[in-house]
Amino acid sequence: MKTDLTHGPVMKTMLRFAVPMILGNLMQQCYNIADTLIVGQFLGAGALAAVGSAFSLMTFLTSILLGLAMGSGTVFSMRFGQKDELGLKEGILASFTLLGAVTVVLNVAVFLGIDWIIRVLQTPADLVGLMREYLIVIFAGLVGIFLYNFFASLLRSIGNSVVPLLFLAVSAVLNIVLDLWFVAGLNRGVAGAAEATVISQYVSGIGIAVYTWVKCPELIRKDRAVCLRWSRVREITSYSALTCLQQSIMNLGILAVQGLVNSFGTTVMAAFAAAVKIDAFAYLPVQDFGNAFSIFTAQNFGAGKTDRIRKGIRAASLTSMLFGLLISIAVFVLAEPLMTLFIDAGETAVIAEGVRYLRIEGAFYYLIAALFLLYGLYRALGKPGMSVVLTIVSLGIRVALAYALAPIPLFGVVGIWWSVPIGWLLADALGLIYYLAKRKTLLKDSRAGVK
């Protein structure tokens, strides 16, 4: 199924396309939510702290593949909007080759450097064994992550956001069932939680690859006119590398903060591990709406429909900011019951710290909603470098402030929490100023920009 996003009512078209993406990534978060819930309830705060720290690392590695897939998807969307079938097919081949090679390199690197990675994360000595046990298994899932993200990005770029949702739904349910079986039933500890996630990742990755091969042969089955051209590889790399850099910087910043959080001990680590899962789950809808808006904009950019892009910007801004505000209110009010989903009610210190985090950062989700729209807009308009700049500003300020404030007794760990919305605010301001100054040239006829 293909959907042309260059026609139809703007708001309705965007929402119809965005909703399956939002639901799909909510399902993807269920991988991590299930691990956290089950590990926290059955294995205790120490195991939860180890899995939470490992999650930050896996998020960083996944962001590399996700960034490459998202950058490739932008090019696919432009070609689809231009009705350039040959360019689309050659771009798909180039992208698959690039992402496959990066996946192999990542797999080798992380297995060789696992002990060094654990040291860099400042993991407490009593958690090193648990974290190593979890990481050895979870790293094996990178190929499954590659397959899912590549084919999901391809299908979304041609307007099909439903099929990726279906495969993630099956995978998420399987993950929860296997988590309970391996951890609670077979007593396999943190390794069991990792095994459940890896199996589920391969189910979604292989499943969506087979679906695309069978149902969309015109996209991926090679014909004589299609070959691996280095011009296509360079084009894909130019978009993908910058988007990958953006995603990696985002998660590298989080990883840097994780090391600082770890220095405050197991209680803060466990609180952060649970709160970050709630955090990611809460703002995920606006993140995915920003990605859907980016694909909508890229297709229309390829088709040269700048008036439709302007209408899309207005509609997306209103929708995303309103939703972000509603989520902020909900998380602020429900912070304590949300924490008790992950942490036993007896762990009062962990719950209190997690609530404090959520009521500081969660009050400002509308700021990150605006930032995700800016990321998507600049990526779709052929300016992925600006998305990188905004990410550097947001994360750079977050990390710098966190490390500056945390050692001061007056702030302590609260300084880490406050650094996040401050980074969002300053990046939003820069992105908006740049758009207002450059909007006439940014929205010029796209046919001149994607030849």
Which residue stretches match the model-derived regions?
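Transmembrane helical elements of multi-pass membrane transporters/channels
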Residues: 16-35, 137, 148, 171, ...
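Hydrophobic transmembrane alpha-helices of multi-pass small-molecule transporters
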Residues: 60-63, 175-179, 205-209, 281-284, ...
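Helix-terminus/linker motif at the lipid-water interface of multi-pass membrane proteins
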Residues: 26, 30-49, 118-125, 181-188, ...
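Residue-level signal for short hydrophobic patches within transmembrane helices
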Residues: 7, 11-30, 34, 57-64, ...
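Short runs within selected transmembrane alpha-helices of multi-pass transporters and secretion channels
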Residues: 69, 137-156, 164-172, 193-208, ...
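Small-residue-rich hydrophobic transmembrane alpha-helices
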Residues: 48-108, 145-164, 271-335, 368-390
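Short alpha-helical transmembrane segments in multi-pass integral membrane proteins
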Residues: 1-18, 76-143, 185-241, 297-364, ...
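Small-residue hotspots at the loop-to-helix junctions and early N-terminal turns
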Residues: 45-56, 135, 194, 266-281, ...
